[in-house]
Amino acid sequence: MKNKYSDLIDQTFHFPTEEFKTTEEGELLYRDIPLMDLAKKYGTPFRFSYLPKISENIQKVKFWFADAFAEHNYNGSYNYCYCTKSSHYKYVIEEGLKNDIHLETSSAFDLDLIKKLHNEGLLGLDRFIVCNGFKTDLYIDKIIELIEMGFENLHVVLDNTREFHLLKGRTEKKIKLGIRIAAEEEPKFEFYTSRLGIGYRYIVPFYEDLIKNEPNMELKMLHFFINTGIRDTAYYWNELRKCLNVYAKLKAVCDTIDSLNIGGGFPIKRNLNFNYDYAYMTVSYTHLTLPTI
């Protein structure tokens, strides 16, 4: 009779996995690291970061996009931006930077990290710095400070007109802007974020009425964020196509826009039953065609 917990695992999941396995003595290992040793040393629950996996995943996603681009003769480029709010630990960010990546920030605190990384010689002025999140007065102050320092590829993603007016007149240097689209929420999603960003039909007027005539501001990016992350659902692809329609309309009146920033990212493995075809989803992106306006 099978009545052990290990029997339930065997019947429910494919085990061992790429990450987890057990020894003959029944010890649980994560990538050959004995977890019981860590539990005895640090107590439970505990959380740790496995640094080699960070670089491995970044290189994987770069390969998937390069492969998909080659398949469709796409001449654009893919730039991976690490979102600092996912982990502010120095050793995590430094591991990511070993892979020629860029950074996305969400608060004034994050820009202190950017400044420190630059002062330590770990982050060049040519890196893309995508400033997302709600812009407090302090956040705006630090954005201007980095622009004055010479961060030539810092992009400020605007959520609303208020943020535009906070930036206006703050520096004589060029300010590169992005606009966040307020995507429609997935039906019955428990947390609503559509209040963040600018509605589809207001984006072109927002550019033409406010940004277009500012001599030191240029629109470079459209930011698309879905809170579920990148999923193979009709809802997700429908929202992305709507975003591409807006991008095409913007491109028709704004020759400086050249980037589509995809937020949310790929889902990560949080349980043994996780199944997601990353390579397929990457290729699916390149099957989408930009509308002709």
Predicted feature locations:
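N-terminal capping/small domains of soluble enzymes
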Residues: 2-137
